[in-house]
Amino acid sequence: MTNIRKSHPLMKIVNNAFIDLPAPSNISSWWNFGSLLGICLILQILTGLFLAMHYTSDTMTAFSSVTHICRDVNYGWIIRYMHANGASMFFICLFMHVGRGLYYGSYTFLETWNIGVILLFTVMATAFMGYVLPWGQMSFWGATVITNLLSAIPYIGTNLVEWIWGGFSVDKATLTRFFAFHFILPFIIAALAMVHLLFLHETGSNNPTGITSDMDKIPFHPYYTIKDILGILLLILILMALVLFTPDLLGDPDNYTPANPLNTPPHIKPEWYFLFAYAILRSIPNKLGGVLALVLSILILIFMPLLHTSKQRSMMFRPLSQCLFWILVADLLTLTWIGGQPVEHPYIIIGQLASIMYFLLILVMMPVASMVENNLLKW
């Protein structure tokens, strides 16, 4: 008799994805982030569901309902902070996951990579709308500033912004629809993640060498299940340390002030995980140019397979490309820092230089370095 996990229609899918899946024997801890992202998503959906049970998406009561969750609901404070800091952990894992893909050339799996980029955009949209829901000062002004960027689109811009707002300013209609979208999007993300996995399992995983591993596979369970469990425990450890010791470390104090359309905060800035893109946006004096640079800073990932000029897939044996990759990481950290600083000297010029450097590294320097390395192979 065949094992039920191999014969049952549903169990068979789980078996082929998480148990008997042939996996390369040499994938490092950088391959842990996929499962960690899955755990983050489940955690966000669960904590979000419990928050939604007590939250009211009305401008008059939204801020009070969040206060009520923290003060009066049993363990409401821990649910709220797990959700807020869970988003930060989600983005840390996302950035690591994308960085791994860039370093080891995983973007050559075109369908998997493109769905991954769509997932990144969807998660960013979800996080942005979630930040608006507590209806604090930074929620309100963040929503106003970011949605207003769409007005830079020629001809239809203004109409588009008013259509998204549901009126002539960010108000009750905006908050209600943002709550609706924020609730539905994680389920769309879950569906996309399944398609992401489906395409990945068509080709099998990449590995650090970038060389085919068809002749050297091991079963996913128990080798990588136990490895994933270690990653999950570390993730929960870091998340709970944040939640229980410094829950407001990554938040903005302005968001503890109820939204007031008549009073603009001195420094409007998004959550830390959007600061790099925000810095690129601010570094261009022209509104439309800034918006285009903002979108391109993430959309550029779609073009990575086209920009791959090396004869080798991975950067494992390419010291020049490695060097440029880590300069890119440093550049992104610089942009993140600049995004949180006021618009004044010397931050403006640093932001502009870092933005130019970002696009130069990806579009020019890395492809050129790859071609140089190709020629060095002949020596």
UniProtKB/Swiss-Prot annotation:
PROSITE patterns for this protein: CYTB_CTER, CYTB_NTER
SUPFAM superfamilies for this protein: a domain/subunit of cytochrome bc1 complex (Ubiquinol-cytochrome c reductase) (SSF81648), Transmembrane di-heme cytochromes (SSF81342)
Annotated positions binding a ubiquinone: H201
Pfam family, any one: Cytochrom_B_C
Cofactor(s) for this UniProt protein: heme b
UniProt entry keywords in alphabetical sequence: Electron transport, Heme, Iron, Membrane, Metal-binding, Mitochondrion, Mitochondrion inner membrane, Respiratory chain, Transmembrane, Transmembrane helix, Transport, Ubiquinone
Record Gene3D superfamilies: Cytochrome Bc1 Complex, Chain C
A GO cellular component annotation in the UniProt record: respiratory chain complex III
Cofactor note: Binds 2 heme b groups non-covalently.
Topology relative to the membrane: Multi-pass membrane protein
InterPro entries, per database record: Cyt_b/b6_C, Cyt_b/b6_C_sf, Cyt_b/b6_N, Cytb/b6-like_sf, Cytochrome_b, Cytochrome_b_C_euk/bac, Cytochrome_b_N_euk/bac, Di-haem_cyt_TM
PANTHER family attached to this UniProt entry: CYTOCHROME B
Record family assignment: Belongs to the cytochrome b family.
Miscellaneous comment: Heme 1 (or BL or b562) is low-potential and absorbs at about 562 nm, and heme 2 (or BH or b566) is high-potential and absorbs at about 566 nm.
Name by which UniProt lists this protein: Cytochrome b
Classification lineage: Eukaryota, Metazoa, Chordata, Craniata, Vertebrata
